[in-house]
Amino acid sequence: MRRAWILLTLGLVACVSAESRAELTSDKDMYLDNSSIEEASGVYPIDDDDYASASGSGADEDVESPELTTSRPLPKILLTSAAPKVETTTLNIQNKIPAQTKSPEETDKEKVHLSDSERKMDPAEEDTNVYTEKHSDSLFKRTEVLAAVIAGGVIGFLFAIFLILLLVYRMRKKDEGSYDLGERKPSSAAYQKAPTKEFYA
């Protein structure tokens, strides 16, 4: 039983140390020391253009509307008495997708306002209108995060109670003196007291 507890404890320590080691290595990978960049080998020059432009900035970008071209063969069936022939022609369809001029936040706001006004006008069709809402900015207002935090707290609390009960059990067992440490107590006959009388010649 004692071996099982030792193995369980070693397993838990290994898991915790592996997680902390993974967090430390990921932090080292994410942040670089600027002073060591000049000393490192194989360093490329810093391109300032990449830092000035960001995803979705749209200030210097030329927006091209993509043209989709699809071709489908259309069979022409001419009925003749001798042999049926199938001739195919190609139909070209060009679709132009207009470029979006509004930001996604503005379009989301418009959808929310439109759906609110539609809900006021026609309350019978509430279930058919589906739109997306932005999630709240606070992390603890989300139900799944709150449930995970509560579950983690309960598990941690139960583990702490288990450790305290184990400690109390071990202390009581130690007070009783029932530990078998694998050491044999020498019998009283093994060590006999030498006579304390001294003889002087």
From Swiss-Prot:
Its main location: membrane. Pfam families: Syndecan. Residues 1-18 form the signal peptide. Residues 170-201 are cytoplasmic. InterPro entries: Neurexin-like (IPR003585), Syndecan (IPR001050), Syndecan/Neurexin_dom (IPR027789), Syndecan_CS (IPR030479). The chain crosses the membrane at residues 145-169. The modification Phosphoserine is found at residues 115, 187. The record marks 142-143 as: Cleavage of ectodomain. GO terms for molecular function: identical protein binding; PDZ domain binding. It is a single-pass type I membrane protein. One of its GO terms (cellular component) is collagen-containing extracellular matrix. GO terms for biological process: cell migration; dendrite morphogenesis; regulation of dendrite morphogenesis. Residues 103-123 have a biased composition (Basic and acidic residues). Residues 90-102 have a biased composition (Polar residues). The keyword Phosphoprotein applies. Residues 42-70, 90-130, 178-201 are annotated as: Disordered. O-glycosylated with core 1 or possibly core 8 glycans. Contains heparan sulfate. Also contains chondroitin sulfate. It is found in: Membrane. Residues 19-144 are extracellular. Glycans are attached at residues 41, 55, 57, 101. Keywords: Differentiation, Glycoprotein, Heparan sulfate, Membrane, Neurogenesis, Phosphoprotein, Proteoglycan, Signal, Transmembrane, Transmembrane helix. Interacts (via cytoplasmic domain) with SARM1. Forms a complex with SDCBP and PDCD6IP. Belongs to the syndecan proteoglycan family. PANTHER family: SYNDECAN (PTHR10915), SYNDECAN-2 (PTHR10915:SF6). This is Syndecan-2.
